[in-house]
């Protein structure tokens, strides 16, 4: 059985200046390019969902870490030409970390959020009586 440590979500947003025909052309070019980048990073179960002037992409990755994310972000950044930009979310499946990146015009910026591990605080919250209504 395959082990996938990371869930990846990408939201691509197209420029409002693109005509409908231009948007469809851009989308048709992005899908195989993004698929190649994700597959090179070990991505599986790649799913695209078109939603008007946005496209959502989801897949799973075998590992979790900057050594995987940074080359992936570099590849995606090369596709962002000002007519499309995206936001990327890497979620480690143990929910210990979230990596978030904004990608536009060939560059990317990231942030990492460390979530607290289950411990005294979360146990205390879990064991509290439910709030009264």
Where are these regions (language model features)?
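Short, extreme N-terminal segment that most often corresponds to the first beta-strand
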Residues: 1-33
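Charged interaction segments
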Residues: 33-133
């Amino acid at each position: 059985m395959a082990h996938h440590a990371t869930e990846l979500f990408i939201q691509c947003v197209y420029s409002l200046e693109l005509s409908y025909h231009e948007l469809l052309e851009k989308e048709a070019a992005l899908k195989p390019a993004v698929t190649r980048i994700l597959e090179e990073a070990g991505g599986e179960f790649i799913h695209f969902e078109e939603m008007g002037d946005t496209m959502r992409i989801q897949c799973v990755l075998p590992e979790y870490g900057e050594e995987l994310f940074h080359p992936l972000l570099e590849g995606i950044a090369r596709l962002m030409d000002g007519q499309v930009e995206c936001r990327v979310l890497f979620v480690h499946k143990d929910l210990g970390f979230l990596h978030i990146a904004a990608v536009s015009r060939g560059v990317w910026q990231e942030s990492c959020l460390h979530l607290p591990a289950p411990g005294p605080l979360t146990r205390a919250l879990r064991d509290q009586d439910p709030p009264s209504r």
